[in-house]
């Protein structure tokens, strides 16, 4: 019996500082695709967030969609935010599952009626303890995970004030809402970064260290230099591809 090939679109929203030397490690789609379970056949495709996604990519052409993180502010009325928000709703209406990560989670929350704003405490970075809510324990996105686990974070905006129909799945201390799921079970968001590892997060942050040191209330270098891997991220991506992506 032939194995079904699942088509997954990665919407790459990462913005790199100008003037960086080429580096193959800055492959955002690869950060996600490397965790594909061996038992699944997945064809990965990447599209930049600034492309005209509503005209170029019909949701019907995909079995699943992942929205990457980004330094963009999901709470602004930037045209990129507006068009991607519209596309998220089109995916839901077409029955296509979507996983939003960090910025993707925030934008998803916004278009579903939640509040998104800068966190008054500023930046959350590095290893972060979180725990599942009752709704999170019931979600297949978190199959195989304990009630409490560590994740890797990199954000200063947060989702809050969830409307009816938007469920809180993962909780944290600094950012209370670390995961959401809509009433259809198609749209899932996580504030943290399941795709990343310490090396990748340092790759992102090394060009930004000097700028951010005076902005934060903790030892930025100590946090970045002593991050530990978080295997929970791989499990969450496995679960999304296995349980939700159409096959």
Report the location of each language-model feature.
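N-terminal beta1-alpha1 cap of cysteine-dependent amidohydrolase-like domains
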Residues: 1-94, 220-247
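Pocket-forming structural segment of enzyme catalytic cores
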Residues: 112-199
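Hydrophobic/aromatic beta-strand patches that form the interior of the parallel beta-sheet core
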Residues: 9-11, 43-45, 66, 99, ...
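Short glycine-/acidic-enriched loop or helix-start segments at secondary-structure transitions
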Residues: 20-21, 54, 76-77, 109-111, ...
